[in-house]
Amino acid sequence: MVKIWNAENKIILERKLWLAVLQAQKDLGQQVPDGVIEDYIKVLDQVDLDSIHDRERIVKHDVKARIEEFCSLAGHEHIHKGMTSRDLTENVEQLQIRQALELICCQAAAALRLLSENATTYSETAVTGRTHNVAAQVTTLGKRFASAAEEMLHAFTNIEQIVANYPLRGIKGPVGTQQDLVDLLGGSEQVELLEEKVRDHLGFTHTLDSVGQVYPRSLDFNVVSGLVQLSSAPANLAKTLRLMAGHDLVTEGFQEGQVGSSAMPHKMNMRSCERISGLSHVLQGYLTMVTSLVGDQWNEGDVSCSVVRRVALPDAFLAIDGLLQTFLSVLEDFGAYPKVIERELNHYLPFLSTTRILTAATQAGMGREEAHEAIKAHAVSAALDLRNNNEGENTLLQRIADDPEIPLSFDELKSAIATSDIGRTDRQIKAVNQVIQQVIERHPESKSYNPQTII
């Protein structure tokens, strides 16, 4: 990702675009002396940022400085004919965006694969489900991974659609009429052929037909909002894992030699999950920046958006890249502590099954609201008893069994809270995994993708 967005790479991409346009112009009848294109090609990779900056200090124009630098190196002045600065920068930035999106697709597909693997591994690991962070019902650890995966699948599909439908601005000139190209090439048909050659060179499937100097900034909003959507599932799961780690239920991995705190030797913090949460907030900040550009275009275009885009676009991609790299590491190094999970589950289990007890009571002929009130009274009493007596046992089932108004025996209650079969979690996980398998088949490169080492 850093390579896609670094300054040297962008300059080389710009030079390649200049030469693609020049070659197309030559093919369409423009006089370009023999050897000129070859001379440009020879110096294509000679990027001296200091020299370009020195030129920019004088001309106060970044593209003009890069034109002068490339022409000086090649010894010719044949590039940029019939073009304006945005013909260069807009198309190259769109190429960078598409390349970055394609890399993100690979990383996200790899994350979906690992989510699927963890969902399968922990599909039968019953855990205390929580709403409002309070013990609620029994769920499985595998379902938590599957739920994150399904949210990420929707975001991933959106990114795929953005890539498939992303349009190139094309070579349109200062206000979008392509007048200079018509004059240069001698007709509209020739300009259309040039557009096709440029589109093919950049690897796009279609080009915008009627734009001004800049392409609509709502396209940038669509891209960055897609990245924010993609970050949501990792951030949600990371927060859940952080909460679970606070009860010693799971770990994101703790390597040999790692230190959790400079003050407290025992600490094993969920620093990577915390990083995921932080990077998701950073991404939302960049979305706010590009949102401010939507509906703010002056006439055919101006450069007030340039400052925002030069920061927000590359940095948004670097943020999602860091988030996904970290997420992949968490998924690879993740571990659970079954005995602690079981201990917590046993502590809460009767409470986690009050809805099942309620269903059993209504099936035995009791009115739902009457049963709800009776079970609630016993549950609150048993919970307070537990909190005030650390050594006490959970007496909820016995309290309900002893209540003559509730037509359920102790054995019937025990049967109602069994955790061997937890709803439809197994089918839900399998359904999500099937969709993920389709993603992996579309992106086979994700099978071998390895995240960078996270420091």
What are these regions (language model features)?
Residues A20-A24, E69, L73, L114, ...:
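Generic, well-ordered alpha-helical scaffold segments in large soluble proteins
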Residues V282-R368, A374-A377:
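Long, amphipathic alpha-helical stalk/connector segments used for oligomerization, subunit docking
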Residues M1-Q178, D183, E189-K197, G260-S261, ...:
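A helix-coil-helix interface module used to build multimeric assemblies
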Residues E93-C106, T120, V134-Q297, S304-G322:
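Charged, flexible cofactor/metal-binding loops and thiol motifs
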Residues V2-A7, S51-H53, V259-G278, G301-D315, ...:
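Short beta-alpha connecting loops at secondary-structure transitions
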